[in-house]
């Protein structure tokens, strides 16, 4: 079976290449992908050949997406052919073969595939929020309102944090954060940034902060 898959074949170079789908082993699941999600941090770093990557080309990337089960191995019992499933560590390709443990059936038919495709990457934002152990009514800040940050902002709102302060240099991201649950959205380059945070929190500062800017200096 022919497959099409995105590979990074060099710095600044991505190609859609053809390869063959392998044989499904006894504990594996073959899925035909509907959506895969681009991780801005990982994919960008690899495409630019940054120092925190292997720089070994060609490389295939991708770790979250959704599709439908095409075939299962003889020992697979959690999913069946035709099931809509989340695929962890699946690549940006038409077909993926992954171990059963990397496959999760989507039980809720009211959730669209496009929405469900983000569950895996959203869970990373949730992980940051859970580590804070924020209590009801405690203040929290999210530094960076990219994909992970905007999810963390929403999870803090759902966790009962107040106020939720979103921080980003980009005005459009700050506006989106306010629409999705932030009580305040601040520009960290504002000379009054620190004082504004103190004013919002009655001089105490925030109880917890999730830092997802992707910038080491932050």
Residue map of PLM features:
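Extreme N-terminal starter segment of soluble prokaryotic enzymes
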Residues: 1-4
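Mid-domain Rossmann-like dinucleotide-binding core that forms the NAD(H)/NADP(H) cofactor-binding site
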Residues: 115-190, 195
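Glycine/charged-rich beta-loop-alpha catalytic/anionic-binding loops adjacent to active sites
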Residues: 102-114, 200, 204
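Glycine-rich beta-strand-centered segment in the early N-terminal region that forms part
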Residues: 22-38, 49-91
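Residue-level recognition of beta-strand termini and adjacent short loop/turns
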Residues: 10-12, 25
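A structural motif shared across PLP-dependent enzymes of the aminotransferase-like
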Residues: 89-100
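Glycine-rich cofactor phosphate-binding loops and adjacent beta1-alpha1 units
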Residues: 180-218
């Amino acid at each position: 079976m022919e497959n099409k898959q995105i590979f990074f074949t060099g710095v600044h170079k991505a190609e859609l290449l053809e390869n063959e789908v392998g044989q499904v082993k006894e504990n594996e699941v073959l899925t035909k992908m509907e959506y895969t999600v681009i991780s801005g941090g990982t994919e960008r770093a690899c495409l630019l050949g940054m120092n925190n990557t292997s720089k070994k080309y060609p490389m295939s990337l991708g770790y979250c997406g959704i599709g439908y089960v095409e075939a299962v191995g003889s020992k697979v019992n959690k999913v069946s052919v035709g099931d809509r499933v989340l695929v962890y560590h699946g690549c940006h390709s038409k077909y993926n073969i992954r171990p059963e443990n990397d496959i999760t059936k989507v039980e809720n038919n009211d959730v669209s595939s496009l929405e469900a495709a983000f569950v895996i990457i959203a869970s990373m934002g949730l992980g940051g929020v859970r580590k804070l152990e924020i209590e009801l009514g405690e203040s929290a800040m999210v530094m960076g309102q990219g994909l992970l940050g905007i999810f963390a902002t929403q999870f803090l709102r759902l966790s009962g944090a107040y106020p939720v302060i979103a921080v980003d240099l980009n005005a459009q991201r700050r506006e989106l954060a306010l629409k999705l649950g932030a009580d305040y959205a601040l520009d960290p380059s504002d000379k009054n940034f620190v004082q504004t945070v103190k004013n919002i929190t009655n001089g105490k500062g925030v109880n917890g902060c999730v830092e997802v800017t992707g910038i080491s200096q932050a």
